[in-house]
Curated annotation (Swiss-Prot):
It comes from Serratia proteamaculans (strain 568). GO terms for cellular component: cytosolic large ribosomal subunit. Keywords: Ribonucleoprotein, Ribosomal protein. It holds the Pfam family Ribosomal_L29. The lineage of its organism: Bacteria, Pseudomonadati, Pseudomonadota, Gammaproteobacteria, Enterobacterales. PROSITE patterns: RIBOSOMAL_L29. This is Large ribosomal subunit protein uL29. Belongs to the universal ribosomal protein uL29 family. PANTHER family: 60S RIBOSOMAL PROTEIN L35/50S RIBOSOMAL PROTEIN L29 (PTHR10916), LARGE RIBOSOMAL SUBUNIT PROTEIN UL29C (PTHR10916:SF0). NCBIfam families: L29 (TIGR00012). SUPFAM superfamilies: Ribosomal protein L29 (L29p). One of its GO terms (biological process) is translation. One of its GO terms (molecular function) is structural constituent of ribosome.
Amino acid sequence: MKAQELREKSVEELNTELLNLLREQFNLRMQAASGQLQQTHLLKQVRRNVARVKTLLTEKAGV
């Protein structure tokens, strides 16, 4: 997910995206814990995407 794509989204869309990413992160962690996750790089990607969305939400809030 590119930062430019995220910058074009509204705050509501970013919040929805954040919830989806957190759900995905939870599912990936459960798969990793049970030994089912083959593509471990996805954990890192999702974690960084969560950080990107949170950063943009903070920027848009003007804090």
